[in-house]
C-alpha cells in the first residue's frame, strides 16, 4: 500500500520564513501582496498554526521563485 505524505506544518512555516527572508521580504510585504487587512494569517503560516490555501501556496511559490514542494515539508 502507498504511504501517504503527512504535512509538517511547523517545518512548512519555517520554510516560509526562510524563503521570505531569502527574497528580502517582510511580513508586511506579503500582507500587501495578498491584500490581507492584518498580517495574522502570514504569522499563523510561519508558526505552523495553519496552512496557506492551495491558491496562496501557488502565489508564495511564484513570489519566492520556487516550486510548491520547496515550501511544503512532509514528515519523514
Residue positions per predicted region:
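Short, charged recognition helix plus adjacent turn
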Residues: 1-6, 62, 72-76
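DNA major-groove recognition helix of helix-turn-helix
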Residues: 45-46, 56, 75
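The alpha-helix within a helix-turn-helix
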Residues: 20, 31, 61
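Residues within the helices of the helix-turn-helix
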Residues: 17, 28, 58
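DNA major-groove recognition helix of helix-turn-helix/homeodomain DNA-binding modules
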Residues: 55-70
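Short alpha-helical DNA-recognition segment
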Residues: 24-44
Amino acid at each position: 500500500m502507498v504511504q501517504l505524505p503527512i504535512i509538517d506544518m511547523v517545518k512548512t512555516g519555517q520554510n516560509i520564513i526562510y524563503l521570505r527572508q531569502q527574497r528580502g521580504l517582510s511580513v508586511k510585504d506579503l500582507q500587501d501582496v495578498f491584500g490581507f487587512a492584518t498580517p495574522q494569517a502570514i504569522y499563523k503560516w510561519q508558526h505552523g498554526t495553519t496552512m496557506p490555501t492551495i491558491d496562496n501556496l501557488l502565489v508564495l511559490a511564484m513570489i519566492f521563485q520556487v516550486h510548491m514542494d520547496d515550501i511544503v515539508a512532509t514528515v519523514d
